[in-house]
A protein has these predicted regions:
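Metallo-beta-lactamase
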Residues: 1-4, 98-147, 191-199
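Active-site neighborhood of phospho(di)ester-bond hydrolases with catalytic His/Asp-centered motifs
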Residues: 44-46, 68-76, 96-99, 158-162, ...
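Residues immediately within or flanking Cys/His clusters that coordinate Zn2+
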Residues: 400, 417
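Short, non-ligating residues that shape and space the ligands of small metal-coordination modules
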Residues: 409-413, 428-432
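Short cysteine-rich clusters marking metal-coordination/redox-active sites
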Residues: 403-406, 420-423
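Active-site metal-binding motif and surrounding structural segment of the metallo-beta-lactamase
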Residues: 50-97
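Conserved beta-strand hairpin/beta-sheet module of binuclear metal-dependent hydrolase folds
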Residues: 2-60, 149-152, 156-160, 253
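FMN-binding flavodoxin-like domain, especially the glycine-rich phosphate-binding loop
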Residues: 170-210, 214-217, 259-275, 285-398, ...
Length: 434
């Protein structure tokens, strides 16, 4: 039970190995479904087709002798919509609520749009269940065009469709951020502007819980999760650090990136992530590239192109609108190295990328010249890091706050327990000076 009137009726899938046929999910997946029990009963979404019987049993157990009045469909991917027909066959008096686009997709999936039992909603439409009033919010391309979200004003719950979801079944405990970030950038990350539009739409709502279609219901510190989605969808830097993504055939490129990682750590880089693209989960590598502020790509010239794993990785980045990052390049080749130019061209459509002045060029193996280039690249990357820290420190020093009661000016950050020395009011009555 999530609230007194809201119950979880979803399922866990530990049989799945690849979500959407491409994302490794060693901890399985959850397909979430919820039910609001009021004068009228609303079921939120169905589940993957393998779990029809379990899901329908969950509904029966939650409702007892009662029957549902509505099935609300937030998203039409089959892991959430496969049992719409089965639900409506079991509960012939129930109506299905969805967007117009969703009903068009139902026609494609099921050969019918359930025209005799449907309620088509638009942005801002409301549904009264009794004490629970639901408001429907359209969320197109987060991450399909038909997506809606629902806000329950009574319990202050946002049903967020695939947004705020994560990989992993609910009976496996793990840190939310890691698998939620990998999920976001793997599946939703391309649609940052659309997510930003939804965040603006929900900003005025008093949200105390978020119920996504995958992963746990978020019931504490909700602003933290919304803040992360704001950072991710605006392609901001979540953490300072350097990701070094590489491929290596005979070990020489690997030696170069290991040397670079060593130099970065010696210079105090806050985080260095070294990723062998041929042996790592590509989605985790993509996640790291979007998490940190700097990325180094190191690969070999291969078949007059670049090594396939690096090519696929850059394609994944570009498809997801990789931007606002510093990028360094390391190329290796024994007779006609051209990898750096190819990698840079592949990233040419990405916005606001700053390429380092230093490009490391290796002819077969490291020598004095290329070792010096590695040193220069490390210095350039760490120099930017130091400059960013100094800028942040200077900004903190130069901030000025003005007391709205007496006009007293305070320079620097305001401590939480600060009191105005003139009139004694707390920091909540200070405003940041322009």
């Amino acid at each position: 039970m999530i609230t007194n009137d809201l119950k979880y009726i979803g399922v866990n899938d530990h049989e799945i190995d690849l979500f959407e046929g491409q994302f490794v999910v060693p901890d399985g997946m959850s397909y979430n479904s919820y039910v609001i029990l009021d004068e009228k009963i609303a079921v939120m979404d169905s589940v993957e087709r393998k779990f029809t019987e379990e899901w329908l049993n969950n509904i029966e157990n939650a409702l007892g002798e009662r029957t549902p009045d509505y099935l609300i469909v937030h998203h039409m991917e089959p892991d959430h919509s496969a049992n719409i027909r089965n639900f409506l066959q079991k509960y012939p008096e129930a109506k299905v609520i969805a967007s117009a686009n969703a009903f068009r997709m139902m026609q494609n999936f099921f050969g019918t749009d359930f025209s005799d039992r449907r309620i088509v909603i638009k942005d801002g439409d409301k549904l009264n269940l009794g004490k629970h009033e639901l408001t429907f919010l359209t969320a197109p391309m987060v991450h399909w065009p038909e997506v809606i979200m629902t806000y329950d004003a009574c319990d202050k719950v946002l049903f967020s469709a695939d947004a705020f979801g994560k990989f992993g079944a609910l009976d496996v405990e793990d840190e939310w951020e890691c698998e939620a970030r990998r999920y976001y950038f793997g599946i939703i990350g391309k649609y940052g502007p659309q997510v930003q539009a939804v965040l603006k739409k929900i900003a005025a709502l008093n949200i105390q819980s978020i119920c996504p279609l995958h992963g746990p219901a978020l019931k504490e510190n909700v602003d933290h999760y919304i803040g992360l989605y704001d950072t991710w969808s605006s392609y901001g830097v979540e953490s300072e650090g350097v990701v070094i993504a590489y491929t290596s055939i005979y070990g020489h490129t690997k030696a170069a990136v290991e040397l670079l990682a060593q130099k970065l750590e010696e210079k105090g880089c806050p985080k260095v992530v070294l990723t062998d693209l041929a042996r790592s989960d590509w989605a985790e590598a993509v996640e790291d590239a979007f998490r940190y502020g700097k990325l180094v790509l190191a690969t070999t010239t291969y078949n007059a192109d670049i090594f396939p794993d690096m090519k696929h990785f850059i394609q994944h980045l570009a498809e997801r609108n990789f931007q606002n990052r510093t990028v360094g390049l390391i190329e290796n080749g024994s007779w006609a190295p051209k990898a750096a130019g190819i990698m840079k061209e592949m990233l040419s459509e990405c916005k606001n990328l700053t390429f380092t002045d230093t490009t490391v060029k290796i002819l077969s193996a490291l020598n004095e010249e290329s070792i010096a280039q590695v040193e220069a690249l490390a210095q350039e990357l760490c120099g930017q890091e130091e400059a960013a820290v100094e800028t942040q420190a200077e900004e903190k020093k130069t901030k000025k706050y003005i007391c709205t009661v007496c006009g007293y000016e305070h320079e620097g950050e305001l401590p939480a327990d600060y009191e105005c020395p003139l009139c004694g009011v707390g920091p909540d009555l200070f405003e940041l000076a322009e």
